[in-house]
Amino acid sequence: MVKFKREVNFSGGDRGVYRPDLIRNICIIAHIDHGKTTLVDRILEITNTVDRRKMREQYLDMMDIERERGITIKAQPVKVMYTAEDGNTYEINIIDTPGHVDFSYEVGRSMAACEGAILLVDATQGVEAQTVAHTYLAIEHDLEIIPVINKIDLPNANIEETALEIKDLLGVSENEILLVSAKEGTGVKELLEAIVKRVPPPKGDINGKLKALIFDAKYDNYKGVIVHVRLFDGQVKPGDKIMTFSNKKVYEVQEVGVFLPEMEPVDSLSAGEVGYIIAGIKEVSDARVGDTITSANDPVDEALPGYREIKPMVFAGMFPGLPEYYEELRKALEKLKLNDSALYFEPTMSPAMGFGFRCGFLGPLHMEVVRERIEREFDLAVILTAPNVRYRVKLRNGEEIEITDPSKFPDEGEILEAYEPYVDLSIITPSEYIGAIINLVQNEKRGELRITENAGKNRVILRFDAPLAEIIYDFFDRMKAVSRGYASMDYEFKEYRRSDLVKVTILVNKEPVDALSFIVHRSKAYQMARKIVEKLKDLIPRHQFQIPIQAKAGGRIIARADIKALRKDVLAKCYGGDVTRKMKLLEKQKEGKKKLREIGRVTIPQEAFLALLKIGGEDEK
C-alpha cells in the first residue's frame, strides 16, 4: 500500500492513505428536468461537502443561463466523502451530465471516466427518448447502472408504471430500483449506500505508467487551461513532465487537485481518482477532450480507447449588430471557444451584412445558448442567420465539395448530385398521439417510419429516418405542440442520402440578400419561399419608394410580395386652381421615388432574420 500525505481538509473526514478500493466514480443519466442537479444538491448536503450557509439550488450549475433555463450545459464534477454503514469513508466522484440532445457529447466524456451510473427517471414523466439513448451508451461503456425513480413526493407520481418501463429497458428486478425524492431528501442515503455496494472500485496500478483521460477542459484567465482528468494508471504531482498523446506536446505540472466542488489543490492524484491538472497549457485545443495524458519521460504505448472528435451539425452566420463591433465579436467567440470545444467559427464576408463569422454548433439549443452568452457576458448584439446543415455536392467536373453556407451552393447547371444528412430519429409518445406524430414527421418533415416498439403501458417508441435539415428548424416545438407536451425525442446522425435540393435566393429591392438565402428540398421550395416573402413584407418597414421582395430558385422568380411606398400628400398646399399644377407635382413625386428606388438602401431589421428560424411550422399550428 502506497501512503502519502493529503493536505486537504475534507469535511467528510480526511484520509491519509491511498485506498483505491474505497473510491467510486459515477455519472448521472437523466432527461432534461428530471431532477439530477437537485439530487446532487441533496448529496452535497447529506455528506456535508458544502457548508449549509453557502448552499443554493442547482449548486453545480455555474452559469446564470443554466440556472435560468434549468438545464445543465457544462458537465461539472464533484467529490464527496461518505461514511457508509460498514464504517468505511468512501470517496465518491460524481459527474453531473447534461440531459439535452445537443449536449450528448458531454455525456460520452463523463461515462468514459466512470465505473457506474445512476439512471434517474422522473416518476411523473417516465422514461424519455434521450434517457434510452444514454442508457445504451452506458451499457456500451460497461457501467454498473443503478436505476432510481425521482419525484416520488409529487401527487401525480406514477411509480408502478415508471418501474415497469425501467424493468423493460434494463431487465432488472423491482427490488433493484430505488425510490427517491431529491427535493425532500427521501431515499438519498439509501442511494449512497447502493453506490458504495453496487458500483465496483476503479481498476488501475498506481505504480504503472501514467495514463489519464481528459474528460473536460476549461480556460482560466490566470492559470491557463484547467484539464479535468480521470487517472487510470500511475500518479501525477506538481513538477512532473507530462505529454498529451495526440499532439505529443510536453508540459510541466504546476498544480493538481480535486473538486469539492470548488477546486482544491492536493499533493498528488493517483490511479482511479478524478481531479484537475494545471500545466501551463495555453489553448483548450491542445487539451482535446478524450485525449490521453501520459508521462513525457516514460510514456504509455497506446492511448485510452475510443474518443471521437466532435463535429458541428448545424451552421449559421453570426454578424455584429453594428459593423464596428466585429473585433469584439471575434474576441467573444474566441473566449467562448476556450470553454466550448464543440463551437466552430471562421470569418466570412456578406455583401448585405458586412464582416461576420460562419459558426458551427451541435444543434439548435447549443446555437441559442452561444448567442445568449455573447449577448449577456460580452454585452454584444448579434444577428444570427437561419441555421442549416452540412450538404455534400458532386459537381459535373467530378469534384466533390461540402457546403455549410447556402450562399456558396453551386448553380443547378454545375451539380451532378446533391446529398443531405439523415438522422435516426426516436420519439417516445403516448399512444393517442401516434397519428399526429407520424403525420408531422412523414407529411411535413419528409421522414420515413421504420419501426414501432412498445415502451410500456400506453406508450410507444417510433423510429424514423429523417433529414437533419427538417429537425433543426422548429421540429421540437411542433412535436411538443401536436403531443400536448408528452412526446420526447432523440436523434443520431445516420448517413448522407441523395436528395433533390435547390437554393432559394431572396432579393430585396432586386438586390440578393445572401444572409436570407437557404437550401431546401425542391418539393418545399415554393411553400417556404411564399411564407418568407410574406413574412418579410410585414417585417421590413415601409420606405419612400415601393420595395419588391422576391424569391428566386433555379433561375426564375417563384414568389413575390411588394411593400407599398410611404406616400406624402404633395397636393396638400393646392387649394383648387390649375389641374396641370397638380399633375406636375405628382409627376415630380413619381420621378423622385424612381430615383430613390435606384439609389435607396433598404434596412432589414434583425427580426427578419429571426423570422426565418420560426418559418416552417407556425402556420400549420
UniProtKB/Swiss-Prot annotation:
Question: Which InterPro entries does the UniProt record give?
Answer: EF-4, EFG_III/V, EFG_V-like, EFTu-like_2, LepA_C_sf, LepA_CTD, LepA_IV, P-loop_NTPase
Reaction(s) catalysed by this chain, per the record, are: GTP + H2O = GDP + phosphate + H(+)
Subcellular localization, per the record?
Cell inner membrane
Binding, GTP: 33-38, 150-153
Give membrane topology per the record. Peripheral membrane protein
Question: A Gene Ontology MF term for this entry?
Answer: ribosome binding
Q: What class of enzyme is it?
A: hydrolase
Q: Where is the tr-type G domain?
A: 21-203
EC identifiers of the protein:
3.6.5.n1
Could you name the domain of life of the organism this protein comes from? Bacteria
GO terms for cellular component: plasma membrane
> Which CDD domains does its entry note?
EF4_II, EF4_III, LepA, lepA_C
* Alphabetically ordered keywords of this record: Cell inner membrane, Cell membrane, GTP-binding, Hydrolase, Membrane, Nucleotide-binding, Protein biosynthesis
Gene Ontology BP, a term: positive regulation of translation
**What protein family does this chain belong to?**
Belongs to the TRAFAC class translation factor GTPase superfamily. Classic translation factor GTPase family. LepA subfamily.
Q: Which NCBIfam families match?
A: lepA, small_GTP
**What's this protein's name?**
Elongation factor 4
